[in-house]
Amino acid sequence: MTIAISRPRALVVRAPGTNRDSDAVFALEQAGADAHVVLLSEILETPSLLHNAQMLLLPGGFSFADALGAGRLFALELSTRLTAELAAFVAAGKPVIGICNGFQALIRTGLLPGASLKAALGPNDHGRFTCEWVQLQPVSQRCIWTADLDADIHCPIAHGEGRFVCDDNTLAALRSNDQIALRYSSPNPNGSVADIAGICDTTGLVLGLMPHPEDHIVPRQHPQFIRGHRGGIGLGLFQAGVRHASQL
């Protein structure tokens, strides 16, 4: 018999240069998780820290100053020293989410898209860092983070390398596997193929997205709040992950 965990333990991995750690903790706590920041160096030294967690979040920022490319060194640390542990984490049914720089790291590790598929996050098509609010449409029923969402999410983006690119075969596979988790329903801000804002792996447990739903968890965080704007908060996405993790 499965006994529900009232507050699943979530780890937010802080690498040198990540800067959305506190926002991520706030979002997870508001969604019902017991969230903790853990240093990447601590996990590398003691991988067993993952054993007692039910959720894992790789936050946004500029890990390792984006040296050699956004998320590359973050991914290198993960893929060379934690491959088996991360695979076991997902195999145990535990949800993982990477946001912005965290998404870039997941792509570079190969955890996304997974299943021998190849994709990348390249420089924005206009060649500039972009910081604006966007509208996201949840579209995947496979992804445990988005399957129960029935309304768009309005949240900010802040990136210079957020353009999702892949070849035609990978795009066809993502579509047929229902791995496209989120699309831009507002104008595409970076030239991502098929308006893709986020994807999941074939298990539906691992989600990566460029926008920052953790920055619109309560209505007052919206820039138009004082003008009466309501709705579109990103809390539901995190609540979905927490619901799944609480059953582990």
Which residue ranges define each predicted feature?
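Short hydrophobic/aromatic-enriched beta-strand-loop microsegments
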Residues: 117-119
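Short, well-ordered, mixed-charge alpha-helical segments that flank or form enzyme active sites
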Residues: 104-108, 114-115, 145, 164-166
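Amide-donor transfer/coupling interface in amidating biosynthetic enzymes
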Residues: 2-3, 42, 48, 86-87, ...
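N-terminal beta1-alpha1 cap of cysteine-dependent amidohydrolase-like domains
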Residues: 1-99, 103-113, 123-130, 193, ...
